[in-house]
Amino acid sequence: MSKGPLFVNPGGPGGSGVDMVRLAGDILSKSVDGFYDIVGFDPRGIGASNTIRCFKDGTESKFFMANRNPVLSPGDNPSNHAAWLKAQANQCIAKNKDFLPFVSTAAVARDIDSLRDAFGQELTNYWGFSYGTFLGATYVNMFPDRVGRVILDGVTDPTTFSGELVNWIKTSLIHTEDGIDEFGASCEAAGPEKCALANPDKALAFDGQHYVAPTVRKYLNELITNPLLLSNQSTPGIVVQGEVANAFFLSLYKVANWPKIAAAFAEAIEYSIGDKLHDYLVEAETDRCPLVEDYTMSFIPVLCIDGTHADQPDLKSYMKGLEDASKVAPLAARLWGTAMMQCIYWDVKPAERYTGPWNQATKNKVLLIGATGDPVTPVESAAKLEVLMEGNGVFHKHNGWGHCSLGQPSKCTIKVIRDYFVDGIVPEKGSECAMEDQPFQPTASLQSFGDNGLSYQELSTLADAVHYAQRRV
């Protein structure tokens, strides 16, 4: 017998819950033993839900995008990049000015409650990933008496997300460099048969103990002035440093992707060819067909409206804040920061914005999951939210790399999730699951995960669906 709808959100902000369920709804259902009706929804302004369009059609959008590289590489003039973003912001605001004040997270939380009511349910069951945890935290504190079973997986700090943008970037990326170091160390431990970069004779750098991570960092620096050629594409082209850095950064989200990105770097370093790196970036888009062609940005409106930017009112002060964040995460802060720079010019005030409190007494306890090696939603954020919720949330520590618990799944955490949703078992304070396999050496890859029989491949597919929905932003 169904326990009712389980609403899911992949994050972003701007991720499509519809695409997520379309791609992996069967796996989500299997993870909860089929006891819930899995419901994905596109939040306001996203996907099939009154998409915010800045251009007339996809052709016009692509023509505009062709005028610049979406990723700012070191050495690029930020003023030129900012001018492009300002032009885009002006266009988007002009075309959507009447609707934009109503796309805040608080507005979407009210929509979730309307969905609950439409399904005839007394309580809301919800599973949110990444930014979806901010949406979930907002909902459970706006509607605490309607909280059923709610899991927030890959928690972003709600106090910084709703605060100054650059500070949120800085505090979100505190483990990104740790992930790069682990990528290198585990590659070396796995050896050349499992990791193409595990060859000290071809290393570009050595720090006295390791060579893979130093090689990757040095190579990314060399690409600033030496872009890669594409040799096997239908048309000639190059891959610039910002794109390669972005490909590597995205690989940190899912440990199962590490062998593939290592092979791409090995090819590029040895032959100065960027085809595998280019293919890594475009693979997710060519393998799937979204229900709605997204002609514009989808994450910028929510990101800029939910936060405050008083300390970064202009490009100069924003770049200073980004420079401080880059001391914590030299690679990722620049990638995130230049993508989010548009908030400087996003002059839209939300009709409603929720910034706390975060300690409302919820009808049921919320499960908060944080992965110890998460590159963008640090485990500390889940622990902090547990404190902020003052007994209404329980933090479960998932020892693993990658983004959210799906970045490097374990039988233990899958069982915690299943037991919470299906049997209503809330883990004890201090709940923790150990890492069950090592990067590049997935001993669990041929095993099923828990009583529900989920396979490692199914969980990998689910992670791809979540990350695909996020990457459309």
Where are these regions (language model features)?
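Acidic catalytic loop of the alpha/beta-hydrolase fold
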Residues: 252-257, 373-376
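Solenoid-repeat scaffolds in large eukaryotic assemblies
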Residues: 260-261, 273, 277
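Generic hydrophobic alpha-helical segments
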Residues: 264-265, 417
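Gly/Pro-rich cap/lid or specificity-loop segments adjacent to the active site
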Residues: 1-243, 301-473
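Long, low-complexity segments enriched in small/aliphatic residues
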Residues: 277, 282-307
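Short edge-strand/loop segments of extracellular domains
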Residues: 267-272
